[in-house]
């Protein structure tokens, strides 16, 4: 029997409690909606964690038993304990997958893994977004057509201050004219990282089948191939030294 991928869906979980418009879309939180969709995939065991939990729900035990961590944050990036970020970073470098969603571009963990400001342009005008699939043979785009559209989104625009992605799989066009690198892949240590742009809280983005298909595909892509601590050993030579 194939082992299921162990996914932890992390959410700040503030907007859904403080903003009625968001609560109407995600009554149990964005993390609950994402979790429900991923559970239907059949090959994933999914749990949630939120900012308000002790250690933000990301204890050593939770992370050691997590294959892929998804991350959504916006209002409280600065409230995330640096010790927890150190812990998450260590696990990513050892092989755990990380999927950062939408405004998580400014999260402590994403900026830590990128080493840049991760700044961008933005505009909230409810405009149309067209996501172009520019890597149709990539595992993350499996089952996705040439493009798909979201009728109402927040605009993100270039320049996006990130390191050059190892692979770019989606480019977004917005009704206002901007474009954006909206699906980006990297490897850091033994771990894989995927940034996926859609997900503004006041629109039902995580109810969209294409969006959730991409996230499910990304979970499979980021599933660890190896989980190994990084050490710096003093080693004996293989061959005899003269």
Regions found by a protein language model. Name each.
Residues 44-47, 120-195, 232:
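Catalytic beta-strand/loop cores that center a nucleophilic Ser/Cys/Thr
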């Amino acid at each position: 029997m194939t082992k299921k991928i162990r996914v932890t869906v992390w959410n700040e979980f503030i907007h859904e409690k403080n903003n009625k418009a968001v609560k109407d879309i995600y009554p149990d939180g964005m993390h609950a909606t994402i979790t429900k969709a991923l559970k239907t995939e059949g090959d994933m065991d999914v749990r949630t964690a939120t900012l308000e939990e002790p250690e933000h729900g990301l204890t050593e035990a939770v992370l050691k038993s997590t294959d892929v961590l998804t991350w959504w944050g916006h209002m409280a990036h600065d409230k995330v304990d640096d010790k927890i970020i150190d812990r998450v970073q260590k696990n990513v470098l050892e092989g755990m997958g990380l999927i950062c969603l939408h405004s998580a571009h400014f999260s402590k963990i994403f900026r830590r893994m990128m080493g840049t400001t991760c700044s961008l342009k933005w505009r909230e005008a409810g405009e149309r977004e067209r996501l172009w699939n520019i890597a149709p043979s990539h595992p993350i785009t499996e089952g996705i057509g040439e493009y798909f559209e979201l009728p109402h989104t927040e605009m993100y625009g270039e320049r996006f201050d990130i390191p050059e992605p190892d692979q770019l799989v989606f480019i977004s066009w917005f009704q206002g004219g901007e474009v954006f690198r909206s699906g980006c892949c990297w490897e850091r240590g033994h771990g894989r990282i995927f940034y996926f742009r859609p997900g503004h809280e006041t629109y039902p983005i995580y109810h969209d089948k294409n969006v959730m298909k991409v996230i499910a595909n990304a979970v499979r892509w980021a599933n660890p191939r190896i989980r190994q601590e990084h050490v710096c050993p003093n080693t004996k030579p293989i061959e005899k030294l003269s």
